[in-house]
Amino acid sequence: MKFVDTNVLVYLADRHDAGKREIAKGIIADAMRNPEEYILGAQALAEFSNVCLRKFKMDADTVRDYLGFLSGLKIAPYTLTNVERALEVKTKYQLQFFDSLLLATAEANGCDTFLSEDLNSGQVCTAA
């Protein structure tokens, strides 16, 4: 399973970086063709919505359109257990808490790949 980080979603909507936008479009297109292989975190959707509203100055209806498009994929909420695990991940890997929460949510949902530009290529993070 592949977990899609917030920045992939952001680049999908970003009109300023065509190269990263094309990569993001490819990832999301593959996710739409193979929805059983991908997971989005509810947190990532919230962060994406915030960036679209504040940074990209999109109106709420446009953001809803993006969310509707993405709603065909599995959406994973986070739990208290994920929050506790995120604290372990944050401490062990010196990551930001919300990045750690996404990683903990991915791990809890059986993901073996975390699609992001925030980690080093091939970096492996586990909370244990």
Segments from the language model and where they lie:
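Short, high-confidence coil segments that cap the C-terminus of an alpha-helix
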Residues: 35-36, 95, 111
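Histidine- and aromatic-rich ligand-binding microenvironments
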Residues: 5, 40-41, 95-96, 118
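Short, well-structured N-terminal submotif of metal-dependent ribonuclease cores
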Residues: 1-40, 55-62
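Acidic catalytic patch
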Residues: 16, 39-44, 68-92
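Glycine/small-residue-rich phosphate/adenosyl-binding loop
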Residues: 53-73
